[in-house]
């Protein structure tokens, strides 16, 4: 039977980039985007409609809704972030990067939108083979609490990957009784 301390130590070994806390779970509270702009509420409504269209794989229509949301409120970082996602799904990474850069310039530093935009931008960089830029953005998203970003950082770290592989082999041998 393992103690909570044992589990915390093992968790830190297996997940070296995960933040530690007394409970083993980091609590990060991200701020919501909120703007004092006359068109912000309408922009949010149009954005929700765009998300529904994107979920139905009606990407052209979704992009139109996100664009309308931005016409109503050009300072809405979430609309840029969501339009970037639709562009990514259409395999238009340049347009997605433009929107993600704009979302990050408008979003507060500790917002859900910033976290999502960092993950999206890092994913594009990773697909392009630009691991340094991907690592930087995944690290920013990880600091904001993204568990996906934390896993990607481990995957991008060759030493952590090697350590995880060796530990997996040790545990497998221990389960099967091998020396």
From Swiss-Prot:
| Alphabetized PROSITE patterns for the sequence | TPR, TPR_REGION
Keywords, alphabetical: Repeat, TPR repeat
Q: Which GO terms describe its biological process?
A: tyrosine metabolic process
Provide an example Pfam family for this protein.
Answer: TPR_11
Concerning InterPro entries, the annotation shows: TPR-like_helical_dom_sf (IPR011990), TPR_rpt (IPR019734), TTC36 (IPR038906)
Q: Where are the TPR repeats?
A: 43-76, 78-110, 115-148
Family membership noted in the UniProt record: Belongs to the TTC36 family.
Q: What is this protein called?
A: Tetratricopeptide repeat protein 36
